[in-house]
């Protein structure tokens, strides 16, 4: 089954007032993207709590989906995550995608006084949390006894609009995380490995084309082990470097400069699925080709923390849609 390409962007990382927030969200929606995404961090440049922000977004948008990208599971008990997520789904008329991850950013954990447990522990806790949340989206009382969470006869309220539950998005970069995502998620975010607790230059090498093919394979292995088919889930990826140029020569010059910083070839950088540089037409063709190669159908355009030009986004979305209709 061939799915259409879809695009997500992040609004500003800070909010100065309701008018600015509302106007930014409406500009994003008008650009033609399919999803607004809010990340979940305490430190660096982040100041917007994602579920609260998406609840506000639900009230001033009509069409776009709303993605938590992604909630760090350690920051909230799954009962609270479920309740807030269910309310966002209701307020939005069924537009929530609930993104969850094991947590990774060491500065967040240190600043909040939280223990950054080993990856295996965090992943097992995430697995339990997702099972609890999925159960709470149902209509029956939930009983759950796990290593990390115990639920006793709790009925999840409010009931979500989307049934059996809003789509579950799980992101990860290593084999264990991507196996887990393949076994449980409706959408799998293929990312760099974040074992170090920070996003550094190593992420560039971890997202080169051969490595991403390996990561996609881990997702499929996890899904197959759980008895799932490839039609049961989608793949998503963040674009960490996006630049739309006026000519291919401008694109080549830009790629050469960036590649030199990391001592890799411009060709290797250009082929990385996390990099999109070229004219609007070339970028559209590249993304469509990557769907064929990797199976990736959802792309976040601004993972590098720069709010994209709405005109550029609209041109890219329109070009992709035109090619898909042809």
Write out the residue ranges for each language-model feature:
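Active-site-adjacent structural elements that line small-molecule/cofactor binding pockets in enzymes
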Residues: 1-326
């Amino acid at each position: 089954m061939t799915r259409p390409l879809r695009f997500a962007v992040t609004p500003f990382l800070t909010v100065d007032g309701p008018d600015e927030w509302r106007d930014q969200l409406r500009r994003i929606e008008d650009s033609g993207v399919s999803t607004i995404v809010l990340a979940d961090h305490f430190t660096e440049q982040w100041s917007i709590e994602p579920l609260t922000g998406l609840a506000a977004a639900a009230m001033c948008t009509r069409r776009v989906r709303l993605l938590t990208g992604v909630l760090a599971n350690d920051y909230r008990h799954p009962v609270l995550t479920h309740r807030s997520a269910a309310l966002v789904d209701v307020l939005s008329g069924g537009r929530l995608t609930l993104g969850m991850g094991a947590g990774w950013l060491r500065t967040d954990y240190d600043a909040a006084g939280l223990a950054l447990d080993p990856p295996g522990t965090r992943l097992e806790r995430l697995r339990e949390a997702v099972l609890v949340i999925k159960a709470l989206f149902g209509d029956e009382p939930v009983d759950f006894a796990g290593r990390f969470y115990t639920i006793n006869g709790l009925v999840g309220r409010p009931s979500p609009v989307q049934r059996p539950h809003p789509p579950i998005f799980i992101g990860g970069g290593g084999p264990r995380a991507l196996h887990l995502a393949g076994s449980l998620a409706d959408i799998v975010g293929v990312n760099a490995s974040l074992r170090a607790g920070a996003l550094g230059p190593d992420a560039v090498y971890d997202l080169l084309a051969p490595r991403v093919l390996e990561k996609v394979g881990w997702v499929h292995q996890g899904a197959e082990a759980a008895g799932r088919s490839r039609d049961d889930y989608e793949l998503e990826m963040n674009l960490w470097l996006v630049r739309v140029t006026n000519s291919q020569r401008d694109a080549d010059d830009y790629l050469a400069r960036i590649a030199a910083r990391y001592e890799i070839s411009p060709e290797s950088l250009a082929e990385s699925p996390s990099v999109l540089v070229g004219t609007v037409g070339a970028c559209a063709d590249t993304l469509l080709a990557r769907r064929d190669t990797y199976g990736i159908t959802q792309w976040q355009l601004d993972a590098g923390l720069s709010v994209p030009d709405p005109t550029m986004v609209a041109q890219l979305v329109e070009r992709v849609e035109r090619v898909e209709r042809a």
